[in-house]
C-alpha cells in the first residue's frame, strides 16, 4: 500500500557511505573502516536510549529502532532514479536529543516533512525478501507524484528511510 505521512522534526544518528549499493554492500564497505563494522555500529545504536522507532525488538532491525536510509548528497553515487545519494544506517532520535554521539557516527537534524510510504506487509525473509524488495523498488520508481500534488524532493540532506522487519513490514 502507498500513503502519505508527516514525520516531525527529529535527529538522525548514523554512519554513511557514498559508494555502496544496497545493504550487504554497505556493510561490506563499512567493515573496511575501523569501528564501523555491522556488529560495532549495531551495538552502539542498541545502547542509545530514546530511539523513536524502538519497539523493544531484540534484533538489529526496525523493531529495535535501527534503520537503513538514503540521504540526498551531491557527493554521493548516482542511484537508479538519477539522484546523487549516500546510504546510511542509524537511528531516529527526538529533535531535542542531547545524549552521547559515538565518535564514528554523525548526528544530523531532519526537518519536519511529508513522506510517501510504500509498504509491504509481513513476509518470509528466506523465500520472499528479494521479491518484496523488487516490488517496493518498482512501486517507488513508477509512482506518479503529480497525482497527489507532490514532486520528488531532491534537496541535499533529504532522508529516505527504509524500515525492514519481515515479521511486520518493509516500508
Identify the function of each model-found stretch.
Residues 1-171:
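A solvent-exposed interaction/effector surface
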Amino acid at each position: 500500500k502507498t500513503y502519505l505521512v508527516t514525520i516531525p522534526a527529529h535527529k538522525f544518528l548514523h554512519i554513511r557511505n557514498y559508494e555502496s549499493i544496497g545493504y550487504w554492500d554497505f556493510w561490506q564497505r563499512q567493515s573496511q573502516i575501523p569501528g564501523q563494522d555491522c556488529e560495532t555500529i549495531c551495538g552502539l545504536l542498541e545502547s542509545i536510549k530514546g530511539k523513536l522507532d524502538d519497539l523493544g525488538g531484540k534484533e538489529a532491525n526496525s523493531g529495535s529502532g535501527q534503520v537503513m536510509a538514503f540521504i540526498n548528497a551531491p557527493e554521493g553515487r548516482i542511484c537508479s532514479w538519477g539522484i546523487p545519494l549516500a546510504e546510511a544506517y542509524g537511528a531516529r532520535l527526538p529533535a531535542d536529543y542531547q545524549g552521547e554521539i559515538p565518535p564514528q557516527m554523525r548526528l544530523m537534524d531532519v526537518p519536519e516533512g511529508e513522506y510517501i510510504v510504500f509498504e509491504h506487509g509481513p513476509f518470509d525473509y528466506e523465500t520472499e525478501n528479494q521479491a518484496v524488495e523488487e516490488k517496493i523498488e518498482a512501486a517507488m520508481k513508477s509512482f506518479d507524484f503529480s497525482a497527489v500534488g507532490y514532486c520528488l524532493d531532491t534537496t541535499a540532506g533529504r532522508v529516505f528511510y527504509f524500515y525492514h522487519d519481515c515479521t511486520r513490514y518493509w516500508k
